[in-house]
A protein has these predicted regions:
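Betabetaalpha-Me/HNH-type nuclease active-site subdomain
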Residues: 67
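Glycine-rich beta-strand-to-loop/alpha-helix junction loops that act as flexible
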Residues: 60-64
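Structured mid-to-C-terminal alpha-helical surface segments
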Residues: 1-58, 70-74, 84-355
Length: 355
């Protein structure tokens, strides 16, 4: 692991607080976000570079990979989304192999994948990261206030919460003083490449290099289409149930992420990558499908990405709560949703034969 993190943690509480406050002022974000980002980066270092975390390969994905891995979104991303390589927990399974199975055999196989991932996350990984955290805190003279525990709200029992020791003042309730390591073994693995991530405070410490290398990160083109599938599912869920899935909590970020990606070359290239689109939808149908998502309709001609009018009020509330995580100028949600609607029109202007 990068010894620079220990150098920072060995400083006094006052010095660490000043570091986080100063970086927050420079970036236009809360000091609590900067502190949490520091621990997000430490956690990524522990997951991908710690000598004690031997085991199956991991893949970094989701919104945090867009911000930390590629700098494509200007949103503080507070949690870590990782996928365990299935074959390395004894569960090799491609979409093609699963499609060839009967319904009962397929269900049993998917359950086996889930159970194997649960065992690894709540056993080996929990033990390894707990040991690394304890060793880091002991070596830097910080009281053992941090801890790692299973997330009691995860019904799949595949997520962990890392409660880190804090030196900043309490912030708003939207930013929890814990990093959620959201895990699973069902996500697509390709394309990916090794990446380097850095905490925000790296720019404030020229005498240190806080780079975290070797972070195997999914390509942003897949993340873009994964987000598109999520938006389609959110809208279809509303159409079927007349409610915003999850009560609209922490979902506006998906609309923002798509908006930001569309403003980047990587996003525009992803829009044209219809092979990736089909692969993402096919994968989601196999591993994450719910009837109310209507993923069979997530094809050119029938994508539904723009929210129903009845969804917008809840999305506005969630977006306002989330806006403190955005650096610099905050895009108006009307502009965000308009861009999503334009994307829907663009995708549906192409027939299946032309896609």
């Amino acid at each position: 692991m990068n010894p620079g993190f220990r150098n920072v943690l060995s400083a006094s509480q006052a010095d660490r607080r000043d570091l986080f406050v100063g970086a927050g002022n420079r970036l236009g974000t809360a000091e609590q976000n900067v502190e949490k980002d520091f621990w997000v980066s430490w956690t990524l270092d522990a997951l991908f570079n710690s000598p004690v975390t031997e085991g199956p390969r991991l893949l970094f994905k989701g919104g945090t990979s867009l911000s930390k891995g590629y700098g494509l979104i200007e949103r503080f991303s507070e949690d870590i989304d990782i996928t365990v390589f299935r074959e390395e927990i004894g569960q090799p399974a491609s979409v093609e192999e699963l499609e060839a199975l009967s319904g009962k055999k397929r269900t049993a196989r998917l359950e086996s994948i889930r159970a194997a991932c649960q065992e690894y996350i709540n056993g080996t990984l929990l033990t390894q990261i707990t040991a690394q955290l304890a060793e880091t805190l002991s070596a830097t003279g910080i009281p053992p206030e941090g801890r790692l525990e299973p997330d009691p709200n995860d019904q799949d029992h595949q997520s962990l919460l890392l409660w880190y020791p804090t030196v900043t003042a309490p912030g708003n309730d939207y930013i929890r003083r814990a990093i959620k390591i959201e895990s699973g073994a069902k996500s697509a693995l390709d394309p990916h490449s090794p990446n380097i991530v850095k905490p925000y405070v790296d720019d404030d410490l020229p005498e240190l290099d806080l780079s975290v290398p070797n972070v195997t990160t999914v390509d942003p083109s897949r993340t873009f289409w994964d987000k598109v599938v999520i938006l389609h599912g959110l809208r279809r869920w509303w159409d079927h149930r007349n409610e915003l899935k999850g009560g609209g909590q922490r979902v506006s970020r998906h609309y923002y992420d798509v908006y930001r990606l569309l403003a980047a070359e990587a996003g525009q290239l992803a829009v044209e990558n219809r092979d990736m689109a089909r692969d993402c939808v096919r994968h989601a149908q196999m591993f994450f499908n719910r009837p109310a998502f209507d993923l069979s309709e997530a094809v050119p001609g029938s994508f539904t990405l723009a929210p129903h009018d009845g969804m917008v009020a809840d999305l506005r509330r969630d977006y306002e709560a989330m806006s403190g995580m955005i650096f610099g100028e905050i895009p108006q949600i009307d502009n965000v949703l308009a861009a999503v609607a334009t994307l829907e029109e663009r995708l549906n202007a192409t027939t299946n034969q032309e896609a």
